[in-house]
Amino acid sequence: MERENVVVEKRGGIGFLILNRPEVDNRLSQDFLTEISHTLDELNVDDEIRLIVIKGAGKNFCVGVDVAEILGLDEVAGRNFFVSLSEMYKTLHRVDKVTIAMVQGYATAAGMGVASSCDLVVASEDVQFGATGVRVGLFCMTASGVLLPRVVGSQKALELALTGDLIDGKEAERFGIVNMVVPRERLESAAVELAGKILSRNPVSIVMGKRNFYACAEMGFDEGLDYSAEMYGVLAATKGAKEGMRAFLEKRKLSYK
């Protein structure tokens, strides 16, 4: 598909999906949301890449939905807009490849949702996160109801959504919203370094492990253990897993790059 608001770059097995509306701080229009979803689907089946990094062009990662567009919508059109937002979150959550959000500046409202929907988050020291919908007369429904409770717990998620307060990188790291905080000039190198560690592992184990992780999160204790045992059996019988185990027993280095 032709892209207007998204740029894709491929380097060393990494697909960079760049949110490219810097003139409006990467605000998410409905067309933009659809474009992100389609691009994620394309990257998920692209054999050239094994991992996806999402970054925002300009000084801010993403400041949420395009409020000017929403203002002109009636109830039906507004619902359709937010269905597109939810579908983008679902697409981001279900891709087989590991996703890393590379976040700088403001990541607010749906922008915080994009980051929280990724598997891992690397942020710059100047980052500001917030479920800020309430500041403009809206409410971060998906962030407070679905995305953030999985990370920070229900009470903190609701507090953030009710107040619209901003939190900095260190506080976000303390709450588990981000995996690491680095100086802004090191942001991309830190994300690439983290990606490199993952890319050095058995690609089949990464895909199956991610799938197992999220599946078990939706299951009860016994069901999760049973499912994991089945997945483990399948994984251990694969060629890549057997080669990894042989290398370990033979005390030799192995790279899956």
Residue ranges of model-derived segments:
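Charged catalytic carboxylate motif
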Residues: D31, E35, S84, T91, ...
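Terminal peptide-recognition signature
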Residues: L17, R21, I36, I54, ...
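Conserved CoA-thioester-binding segment of acyl-CoA-metabolizing enzymes
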Residues: M1-A57, K90
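Crotonase-fold acyl-CoA enzyme core
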Residues: K90-V204, V234-T238, E243-R246, R252
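Short, charged, surface-exposed hinge/linker loops at domain edges
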Residues: K210-M219
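Glycine- (often His-adjacent) and acidic-residue-rich active-site loop
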Residues: T34, V45, G56-T91, A107, ...
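Short C-terminal tail/terminal secondary-structure segment
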Residues: K253-K257
